[in-house]
Amino acid sequence: IEDINLKVKNINCKFSIFVINDGSTEKYDDKRFSTEEIRVQIISLLKNVGHARSIATGLKYIYEKEDFDYVIPMDGDGEDRPDEISKFIESTDYYVDKAIVGERIKRSEGSIFTFFYVVHKFLTYFFTGKSIKFGNFTCLPKSVVKKFIIEKSSWNSFSGSLVKIEKSFGSIKSTRGKRYFGPSKMSFLNLVKHSLSIISVFKFNVIIRSILFFVIYFAIINKNISLITIFPLFLLIIFLFIIFNLSNRENIKEFNVSLSNIGDVRPH
């Protein structure tokens, strides 16, 4: 928080920081931060609803309770660098009333993660026709936040929902920062779930492209059918089952009452 304050203090804008406590029971240092004119509010959730839903709840709260022009959702672990907030603000002059995304140009993960990230991008494009190169580190004008909080897929995937509601974006180049402390607690299984949740937002695209793949592939193997050649089709069926199961996370009724999961909002 103090790093954000340092980076934005010379920008001619009024800033507020909203920290989402996602139901954590861990103790933290309750010292007051030196933030000069920046207002800091902590939104504490009663239960942990996951990363995407915590962001969605925060955006809904800000839209309904606060007066603002732009919101910049970002992780608080250091991987979304405060240095790049000024880039977002400067870009609002060029991308008027548009969502601006932070596209990663340099990543700090190992080769294994990088490999699976490339696989994720390929599968996303192959099955949805969408190239998604960003996460939640974005700059959203109020008009986009308004659309975001009435879109049911926002309760499932942040980036997937944003691509669904917006036809075009502005962008800045973003470098992944180093974590402030410790390794990420997100498991490989949760990373896979996160990836497939993005794809599940476009389940109808997935159906159409899967049917086309099935027809073309079956035509190719028609004269050479065996357990080996039909194995990819079994994998496709399993993939479709998972995608449709994850798409059930899109629940506008739960999203509409998400503010009831807020225990308190207090200044820090």
Language-model region placement:
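Short hydrophobic helices that act as membrane-entry/anchoring signals
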Residues: F113-T128, N190-F204, I208
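Short, acidic, metal-binding catalytic loop of nucleotide-sugar glycosyltransferases
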Residues: E2-K14
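A conserved acidic beta->alpha catalytic loop
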Residues: N21-D29, G78-E79
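Short beta-strand/loop segment that forms part of the nucleotide-sugar
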Residues: C13-S24, I43-S44
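Residue-level signature of catalytic and energy-coupling elements of molecular machines
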Residues: I4, G58, D77, L123, ...
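Terminal low-complexity segments of carbohydrate-biosynthetic enzymes
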Residues: I207-H268
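Catalytic donor/gating beta->alpha subdomain of glycosyltransferases that bind UDP-sugars
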Residues: T92, S143-N205
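Acceptor/aglycone-binding surface of glycosyltransferases and processive sugar-polymer synthases
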Residues: L45-K47, H51-Y61, Y70-P73, E79-N156, ...
